[in-house]
Amino acid sequence: MAHYKAADSKREQFRRYLEKSGVLDTLTKVLVALYEEPEKPNSALDFLKHHLGAATPENPEIELLRLELAEMKEKYEAIVEENKKLKAKLAQYEPPQEEKRAE
């Protein structure tokens, strides 16, 4: 009997945890949205995944990292372009490959 109460207590703690963290509310909202869909999707699981993924608030750090990534990509492209120009400029001052081999 004591084992049964311990398991029940653990379940109750877990239920409260899910409730406090907003999991139950979010799951309920997504399931209600699926229920209210006029045309049910072919994959209910994909529907849930899509809506649960969209339900999480965007972390501000993620947005900052996205912006930083975009900036770094631009800088990278500029550096690659500059590198091409410098190689072309350098090639003007270097002797052709045949002259190098003769030396």
UniProtKB/Swiss-Prot annotation:
Tissue spec. comment: Highly expressed in heart, placenta, pancreas, skeletal muscle and kidney. Also present at low levels in lung.
Protein name in UniProt: c-Myc-binding protein
Coiled-coil intervals, chain numbering: none
GO cellular component labels: cytoplasm; mitochondrion; nucleoplasm; nucleus
Signal sequence extent: none
Positions of transmembrane segments: none
Organism encoding this protein: Homo sapiens
Lineage: Eukaryota, Metazoa, Chordata, Craniata, Vertebrata
PANTHER family the record matches: ASSOCIATE OF C-MYC AMY-1, C-MYC-BINDING PROTEIN
Function: May control the transcriptional activity of MYC. Stimulates the activation of E box-dependent transcription by MYC.
Keywords: Cytoplasm, Mitochondrion, Nucleus, Transcription, Transcription regulation
